[in-house]
Structure formats: C-alpha cells, structure tokens
Amino acid sequence: MAYVPAPGYQPTYNPTLPYKRPIPGGLSVGMSVYIQGMAKENMRRFHVNFAVGQDDGADVAFHFNPRFDGWDKVVFNTMQSGQWGKEEKKKSMPFQKGKHFELVFMVMPEHYKVVVNGNSFYEYGHRLPVQMVTHLQVDGDLELQSINFLGGQPAAAPYPGAMTIPAYPAGSPGYNPPQMNTLPVMTGPPVFNPRVPYVGALQGGLTVRRTIIIKGYVLPTARNFVINFKVGSSGDIALHLNPRIGDSVVRNSFMNGSWGAEERKVAYNPFGPGQFFDLSIRCGMDRFKVFANGQHLFDFSHRFQAFQMVDTLEINGDITLSYVQI
C-alpha cells in the first residue's frame, strides 16, 4: 500500500547516499527541511548542500558540514562560480557517533536557522537568494531515515520520490497519479517543538481525507505514549493510539464511559527507544489509516461514527515532539 502524502508535506524515506534530488517547487522562505538519520560509529564528516542546480559544480547557497577531525566543529559556507566564500565555523558538535539525530533547516527571511535534536544551533545569513535553490544534496558518514520538505508546493512535473515513497515511484508500472480531490489534506498551521503533554484543537472537526502529521522522538527510557482523537464535550475517544515500547501498538476507543475491545496486531513496531518517528494519521470515510515512517502500520475502523465531532488531539507520554500539523 503506497503512502501518498498531503500537498505541502513531501517526505522521502530511507533514501540512499549520495542524495541529490530536487526540492519540490523550489526553496522559499517559510519552508523547513527535516532530516532524520544516524551518525555512523566511524563518522568523520558529512554535508548538506542547498544547491543551485543539479550538476556537479553547481553553486551552493548553503553548505553545512560537521567534521569529527580532532577539532570537532561544524563548517558553514557558500560556493559561487566554483569558488568557496569565507568559512563560518562553530566549534561545537551536536551529533554523536552511532546516535540518531534530527536536523532541521528553517528558511527565514534573513538566514537559515539550524536546529539539531530540538535545540537551536546556528543561523547562517543568506549570501544567495533563497529562490535560486533548486536541489538538496546529502552525503557522508551517516545513514538517512527520512528527508521531509515542509511548507513547499508540489513540483509541477512528477519525479521519482516526489509524491510517494521510493518503493512506489511515480514511473512504476501500474502507478496512477492521485487526483487532487483524493489527496489527503492538512488544514491547521504547523506547530514546531510543542511541549508534551500536547493538546491541539481540530478546527472544524475531523473530515474525510484530513491528515494529521506527528514527528517526534521516543525517549531512551520510554515505556509508552498515547495519542487520542477526542470529543471535548463528552470525553469520547474515537481513536486511542498507545504504542508500548518493546511490545505492540495498542488501539482502542472510549465511548459512553467504557473502553472497547483492544486491537494489537501489527506487522512491526516502529517505535524504539532513542529513535525518531514520523507518523501520518488519515481519517477516511470508514476508517483511520495510519502510516509510520512511510510504511502502512494499521487501519482502525470507525467505531465512533460521528467522527466529525472529534475536535481535540491529545498527545502524552515518554516522547518529545518536533512537529505537529493538524
């Protein structure tokens, strides 16, 4: 089952290195790029380039380059017409060998804001106009779990990985491009690094195709966490999602003061201690469809039929959150 993301949310899962792909719709102020991965045990360096074009030797508007070389540091620079500019350096290393990380680039009007594992790390002033950037390049001593472009527009023409995960590229036999009226939708503004417990209002209630995106980190000592789709006025819970670390992913509903029958069967549990996750929950006509890290996790048939009354999202437990969009 192919994962089809909502417009404005462009993920690629488990991409191979070197990663060299277009940025959907091009880079613009207000966009964010999320990179989740793991630094290799023998890591010496890696880089992320915001490039002006796809060719080798293309200008690089922003070069981000962590280096483990005895003087652990991160180097920042810009390349124009084959010449590197003046380096900026920060003698601090936010990455740990053998550890998972989340690296976020937020495109601000005056600079790129770099956030690592939820902590602000650096601001790099624009030397080239943001609108010139067309491609993202990543390579080096790391493993990639996912790359997400948030807030941009879909590319005018499809390319492999643009609207589906790599296992279902747009050019695959039997692939039918989704129609706009069948695409999932996100209606609320994104919230960055919200505190846990989190409570968010689902303005207008749940509707068919509405998709909720939750990106977070499972704490190393985690036991479980909870996501509830709730009716604020009655306390009914249309979907209670309870990942239990090292066990299973429990689903249930709470109606008229009573819990229903638990559902526990999943092919795999994607929530491990010390790992990042990317969760997509889509409301359908007769069920919720849930994807984790781009892979179908489970369906949950509606027990609470008046799902349009669901107006509250609750998240609590042994996690931190980096991004929620409802």
Swiss-Prot record:
Record-linked InterPro entries: ConA-like_dom_sf, Galectin-like, Galectin_CRD
The entry's keywords: Lectin, Repeat
Gene3D superfamilies membership: 2.60.120.200
CDD domains per record: GLECT (cd00070)
Any matching Pfam family: Gal-bind_lectin
A molecular function GO annotation: carbohydrate binding
Tissue spec. comment: Epithelial cells of the embryonic and adult gastrointestinal tract. Expressed at about equal levels in colon and small intestine but much less in stomach.
PROSITE patterns, alphabetized: GALECTIN
Record domain Galectin: where: 19-150, 198-326
Domain notes: Contains two homologous but distinct carbohydrate-binding domains.
Subunit (UniProt): Monomer.
Protein name as it appears in the record: Galectin-4
UniProt source species: Mus musculus
Annotated gene: Lgals4
